Amino acid sequence: MVSYKEAGVNIEEGYKSVDLIKKHASKTFTKGVLNNLGSFAGMFELPKYKNPVLVSGTDGVGTKLDIAFRMKKYNTVGIDCVAMCVNDILCHGAKPLFFLDYIACGKLEAEVAAQLVEGVSNGCIQSECALIGGETAEMPGFYRDGEYDIAGFAVGVAEKDEIIDGSKIEDGDVLIGIASSGPHSNGYSLIRKIVEDLHKDFAGDKIGNTLLTPTKIYVKPVMKLLEKYNIKGMAHVTGGGFYENIPRMFKEDFTAVINKKSYPVPNIFNHLMNLGVEEDHMYNTFNMGIGFVLCVNEKDGENIIKDLIEMGEKGYKIGYVKKGDKSVELI
């Protein structure tokens, strides 16, 4: 008789991983969570809103995972997974409520799966949302041993009349950029092509570790700013950089004018340019040091920057909005 284990699926290792995962997930529970992990579905009680709108987003980590495999460091990419989802729904003014993850692998190693979910849990804690469920799929022969994929799904809520959709953006509004922690989770196919030795020294550490710096989660500072200021539009700067993402906040035909000298570009991006990537291609691929952009009235710009500094963030007036054609102009 052929067993499931002989086919490549280790049920006992699966049970072990679930026990380890529960320990991390329980730390994320908020008052809206109605049941524990292990049920067929996660349940979450919607907070008291007058006219609530659910806002959802899903994403993965992409080929940054290959850096994690090669460095044998698995507890940071889960943060990336959460960040990519919650930062997206944040762009519409939504407060994250809960998160679901999906992990797939060729051969399940409970300790590695637990490290991945440890990262997811840390990301959920940073964004004040609950990890209420997920799936770990062992798929022998589909993924190579030692390889994993991770994706996630976030749900948030916003009052219908407070949704930020870019409809109030005007000619002359200013753009406030909030610093990124590095490349975040985008451009890693290019990075993997030009960075050959991940153990090479960079700024006092291995460059592989630098490249695994988690994507910054902007939920807490931005939610505080939303309580105080009229924020008209927001953009999460992901794949495609400024060019691809800032115009997504525009409902009408505007052009974002960005001053490249208005903020310091982190050394990791200069290093990548020195390895042979042209500057224009860098701005078409990476966030170049700005991970999140706010569009606000000019009169609020300086106060928002001051508030960001008080919250431990780095904020810069990086440009302004003018009538145009849903584009970005770098100067």
From Swiss-Prot:
It is an enzyme of class 6 (ligase). Pfam families: AIRS (PF00586), AIRS_C (PF02769). It is found in: Cytoplasm. The keyword Nucleotide-binding applies. One of its GO terms (cellular component) is cytosol. CDD domains: PurM. Signal peptide: none annotated. Belongs to the AIR synthase family. Coiled coil: none annotated. Its EC number is 6.3.3.1. It catalyses: 2-formamido-N(1)-(5-O-phospho-beta-D-ribosyl)acetamidine + ATP = 5-amino-1-(5-phospho-beta-D-ribosyl)imidazole + ADP + phosphate + H(+). GO terms for biological process: 'de novo' IMP biosynthetic process; adenine biosynthetic process. One of its GO terms (molecular function) is phosphoribosylamine-glycine ligase activity. It comes from the Bacteria. Gene3D superfamilies: PurM-like C-terminal domain, PurM-like, N-terminal domain. Its main location: cytoplasm. This is Phosphoribosylformylglycinamidine cyclo-ligase.
